């Protein structure tokens, strides 16, 4: 479980932008946003503080995952693993029907595995894939209060780790206690950390019809190499619905290296509306991570949720 928590600390967050990507096969070909111009934003009297406060105080993003239990839907999950030359050496494809009409049922419509996916004991080769299953297959079966104090671990080791996992995903900007060497590096909205980042915001259109703001936080280009190397979050992009200022998407680009581990990851989560309820529609991940005495892990995910239908009696 500790290894899963560490991995997730290196791979959270959200929304594809013009950042540095790992040069290999990318399963995500779904384009969702068209940008307009920064000029439109200035006329709206918006400022950086309003966007940051919205990110810190938002609860709707996690609630969208909680809302999934009220719906039946189809999930298509694709996982790719890579060798040291970034050639695909393993594939997983799952098409799953999640049925919440009455007692919850999960039906595999398609289940395909190719290449080096499992160990001899039947467990996944990569902690990356194990993390993926643990978090996103169970996202709407857990409780989470974004602004609650960090867990003291009294609920048991596993429960403490789960609290950290959920905080990393759904409440960016908070420090994560109990994760050595990187727990404080997620706290990017402090006065000290803000001096290292540029902030820009644009107007755009999401899914061809939803008017949105795109708020981007990125490392200043004129910093020294030493300073840049010490900043874990290279870029954080958040998509806001103009009509209600709720968050529809998040993207993060993270890279960090020290004596204990080395990672380079990008992750994206997107939402949409079904019967006026916000629900997750796409999750993507590209990442490499490495730590001593273990094989370097290289993987990408594409998760698409579709055909949401309100479950009977929900």
PLM regions with names:
Residues 14-16, 182, 246:
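Compositionally biased, low-structure terminal segments
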Residues 22-212, 217-226, 297-314:
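Structured extracytoplasmic
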Residues 14-15, 19, 61, 260-261, ...:
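Alpha-helix boundary/interfacial micro-motifs
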Residues 8, 13, 27-29, 204, ...:
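Residues embedded in well-ordered secondary-structure elements
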Residues 186-192, 208-313:
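Gly/Pro-enriched, hydrophobic low-complexity segments
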Residues 1-26:
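Bacterial Sec-dependent N-terminal signal peptides
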